[in-house]
Amino acid sequence: MKITKLILFIVLFSQGLFASTLHRGLGPEPDSLDIHQAQGLPAIQLLREIREGLTTFDAAGNVVAGTAASWEILDDGKTYRFELRKNARWSNGDALTADDFVRAWQRALAPITLARTAGLLAPVMNAREATEGLVKPSAVGIKALSATSLEIKLNVVTPWFLEVLAHPVAFPLHVEDMAHPLEAPVNGAFMIDNLTFHALIRLKKNPQFHAAESVSLDVVEYFPIEDPNSELSRFRAGELDMTETIPAGRHDWLQTYMGDVLKVSPYIGSFWLGINVGRKPFVDNVKLRRALSLAVDRRIIARLVVGAGELPAWSIVPPGIAGYSPQAFDGSELDQEAREQEAKRLYTEARQGKNKPLLIELRYNTSSQHRKIALAVSSMWRQVLGVDTELVNEEWKVFVNNRRQGVLTQVFRGGWIADYADPTSFLDLFRSDSDLNTTFYKNEVFDRLMDQAIVLKGDERMQHLQRAETLLLKDMPVIPLYFYVSRHLLKPTVTGYEPNVRDIHLSRYLGVKSKTP
């Protein structure tokens, strides 16, 4: 009898029925799996699972070697030379070469690509000129010295450059990527096994990955779930091992009844409402934008509406970035009653001669938490200023596209998670030439301060960036609401999870405790 059971176990295991599988919530459907078009967190998370750059992140969120085995920094920080791993291969067995990086970067910086995050490569020599069509992409400062050696030249010293190399925009591309990106070979710890939109993205272990022997999971199943309440229900039903987030207002309940599986950690990220300053009624109307900002009680939003340890935001850049003191907008030093009085004064001046109540559209992507925030903000605007608000809810891809085009948007859900630990990760979003500038804010002085900061170092550089943030907050193209914390539910059977301020948890470091069949 024991022999029969043993034989049955061996057969079942060989068929993959006891394969080590992790089930994860993803949040919204990825906006794109093209490394040069993806900009949402779900897409970036998936791309980091199936692809890898010269650098990557370890379980604690630290930058470590990825496809590169080693590197040296020369020319006082302006030249990087990388040696690729000898066992770096694509999932089809092809050798991964330095030319695969050159090909990818030239595509990222070609004007025709319209890469959404190409600005991250701006420190690279001729990168900005290439995106503007002033030079050919082949003139960009990246070249293959040999099949396994790569050289990158920068315009200026960029302390966070190694972090940028771990972003999808800096990943390599197989030659087949140019025609069939979803079917092309990948170089990450996993590869796509099954993709069913709005239902399941199934990843399987990539045996060609350079560190495949250290990856304990055989399969990772990601479930796109926009509604955090639905995600919570599926976690409680045993369908998920790890959630992407928790529902708004449920932190205290979860802490009381599910505290052993609740993981809350600091996070370098800001949540705000963006204002399309290129559309009426916000064009050349700073007083109206400031009035709307001052009328919002951020403490209520952070503590009661969201309620998971978030901090009220008075700035765009969050705390926690070494050497930088976030600036606060005018009026943040007042108590809420005084802020509301100032909001009324500014609103009256902004609406002088107009008797009809103002109607504003507030657009957000599908999420019960985003809806609660939108309802709370619209209630505050109504109570303090008499402003009416029309709430518009959209599926993630539609929302991202409308926000990018700026034809329909007035006020919209916004925010940013740091791509690297520097103020420019947030402030660069508002440069007039940024592809991610969804507020359509344009200020030559702001752009000049950002340009000047590029060639500065130390305290002088940080002071320039602080002046830029101060100017940005005076112009108020966004309404800061709160600073993020990461929030997950994690089954005790999941191993290898380490909280970190980047909230990056690659499945290659995770595992699932084996179950006895």
Question: Model-flagged regions — what are they?
Answer:
Residues 25-75, 106, 185:
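N-terminal lobe/hinge region of extracytoplasmic solute-binding protein
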Residues 97-104, 147-153, 188-189, 216-219, ...:
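Alpha-helical secondary-structure segments
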Residues 312-349, 367-371:
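Structural transition elements
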Residues 488-517:
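Long beta-strand-rich cores associated with HINT superfamily self-processing modules
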